[in-house]
Design a protein with these regions (language model features):
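Start-transfer (signal-anchor) and selected internal transmembrane alpha helices
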Residues: 1-15, 105-108, 200-205
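Short helix- or helix-capping micro-motifs
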Residues: 9-12, 114-125, 149, 168-172
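Short acidic/glycine- and proline-prone juxtamembrane loop motifs at membrane-interface regions
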Residues: 25, 52, 126-139, 299, ...
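Membrane-embedded, lumen/periplasm-facing catalytic core of multi-pass transferases
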Residues: 329-427, 432, 443-445, 461-478
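Transmembrane-helix motifs of polytopic, lipid-linked glycan transferases
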Residues: 7, 83-108, 146
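Hydrophobic/aromatic-rich transmembrane helices and adjacent perimembrane loops
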Residues: 37, 131, 137-139, 171, ...
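Signature aromatic-anchored transmembrane alpha helix within multi-pass, membrane-resident enzymes
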Residues: 2-10, 205-206, 210, 277-281, ...
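Membrane-lumen/periplasm interface segments of specific transmembrane helices
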Residues: 171-172, 178-245, 249, 253-256, ...
Length: 478
């Protein structure tokens, strides 16, 4: 059953990798793909986080390694290296689903029930949707789930617990917010009065913190620079969410909208699982509570909760089997898997109202392939031999794929950039209603048009930094 579930979930993610060029949130480009592209290939738009040093190079560094590998074997077309990254993210997602299975098994669940619980992350529509995206939340899910599987098992050896704590540190280096899991694990061991285990974990996590500081020192020049600047932005500058604050019930509402049947069944089974896996339940509760009380909310922030709740559901099936009725447990397992399959089958109906982040402004818009047509035209533009500059007249540069899709050493302007008579670019991406120049390609209501043969006038003032960079730099005193 586990292999079947993983195969279906993996196939769905691979299919999505090939047909969806949309962007859920700019972070999946400008905090992962774009800095990696700039590191390997040269050109790239610069977000304030990676211009000022408010994020670690862990995730972009890993993606850069994939880009270097692609470049070495001749896969240097955007379609080739982007699909490579998406496939790698899909592999991480499937490994995360397997880690959820392992977590349930190590906490007492039989293979059938553990596999059913793993189906929550492997098959549920929202989890599949986020699977190919190069977000720190999805990239760090595997070390979290695997780390907890090693650390929380009653049969865990000292080596298991040390390795589990180390994996949580790796997740924190990739995404600072994951420090909540480190604190939650420590809280569990304090509650259990396991002082020797706690001492080992403190040593490991101290080493993990040192690794984070060392990475920042090597890449940014200062110890813990990414953490310090991010915390300063969040708490001193009060950098709030672009989409506005959300109520404490936000995540419950979004789970119920995006996968209502899975949420109902998995939550009920997870409650039963608490009877046998109090330590895991405590970790999940601490993680969710921390996000419930934080005004800045986004669905992707809690994506790692899905495999953890799935593991609890698998354990809950075992509890039902052992304490009440084996027949009831089998029926509940079948129901859980069926709801996951239904969620996958109806995944294409997901809207931004279901999974955010535009639930307040674009709730009825499909969550799939948003700005995908423009990104595909960026790829087409990058293949034009006579291109010497491009202006995107339909979207702010923050909301499209940047140089990760526009794979050329040429200026990339937004609609607020120089006018067409400037001579600084000779291609535009605009609406299909536009008639200037000659059409080269069209996609979904947008068209790439050639204004002239070039060459373009050099632009010594071209600035690859995204808007808002200078304001944040001044606020941080950099």
């Amino acid at each position: 059953l586990l292999l079947f579930i993983l195969a279906i979930g993996g196939a769905a993610r691979i299919w999505l990798s090939l047909v969806d060029d949309g962007i859920y949130w700019p972070d999946e480009v400008y905090q992962s793909l774009e800095p990696a592209h700039r590191l390997v290939f040269g050109p790239g738009l610069v977000s304030w986080e990676y211009g000022l040093g408010a994020r670690t190079w862990a995730l972009p560094g890993l993606i850069a390694a994939l880009f270097w590998l692609c470049q070495a074997v001749g896969l240097d077309d955007p379609r080739q290296y982007l699909v490579t990254v998406r496939f790698a993210m899909c592999a991480l997602a499937m490994a995360t689903a397997w880690a959820g299975y392992l977590l349930a098994r190590r906490l007492g669940s039989e293979p059938l029930f553990a596999a059913s619980g793993a189906g929550v992350f492997a098959l549920a529509g929202p989890a599949v949707y986020f699977g190919p995206k190069a977000l720190s939340e999805t990239a760090s899910a595997l070390p979290i789930v695997l780390g907890l599987a090693l650390a929380l098992s009653p049969q865990a050896t000292r080596r298991d617990r040390i390795l589990g704590a180390a994996l949580l540190c790796v997740a924190t280096i990739v995404r600072l917010h994951n420090a909540v899991f480190c604190l939650a694990l420590l809280a569990v061991w304090v509650g259990q009065r396991r002082w020797r285990v706690l001492a080992d974990a403190l040593v490991v996590m101290g080493a993990g913190a040192l690794a984070l500081g060392t990475l920042d020192k090597l890449t940014w020049g200062d110890w813990f620079q990414s953490a310090v600047l991010y915390l300063r932005f969040t708490f001193v500058m009060r950098g709030g969410p672009v989409t506005g604050d959300s109520p404490a019930t936000y995540y419950l509402e979004m789970f119920a909208r995006s996968m209502p049947l899975v949420t109902a069944v998995a939550a009920a089974l997870a409650i039963a699982g608490v009877l046998r896996a109090r330590s895991l339940a405590a970790v999940v509760a601490i993680f969710l509570l921390a996000h419930f009380v934080t005004p800045n909310k986004a669905y992707r922030y809690v994506i790692v909760a899905i495999p953890l709740i799935g593991a609890l559901a698998g354990i809950g099936l075992q509890v039902i089997h052992d304490r009440w009725s084996p027949r009831m447990s089998l029926a509940a397992a079948a129901l859980l898997v069926a709801t996951c399959v239904w969620s996958l089958a109806t995944m294409r109906t997901l809207t931004f109202g279901d999974i955010g982040p535009y639930e307040k402004t674009r709730a009825t818009d499909s969550a799939f392939d948003d700005v995908g047509p423009v990104n595909r035209l960026l790829i087409v533009a990058s293949r034009q031999p006579d291109l010497c500059g491009l202006r995107v007249e339909t979207h702010h540069l923050t909301w499209i794929g940047g140089y990760s899709y526009f794979h050329r050493s040429a200026p990339l302007y937004s609609a607020a950039g120089p006018d067409r008579s400037s001579g600084l670019y000779n291609f535009i991406i605009t609406s299909t209603a536009e008639t200037a120049g000659n059409p080269v390609a069209d996609d979904g209501g947008f068209v790439l048009r050639r204004l002239g043969a070039g060459p373009c006038t050099p632009d010594p003032s071209y600035d690859p930094r995204l808007p808002g960079y200078d304001d944040i730099r001044q606020g941080l005193g950099r």
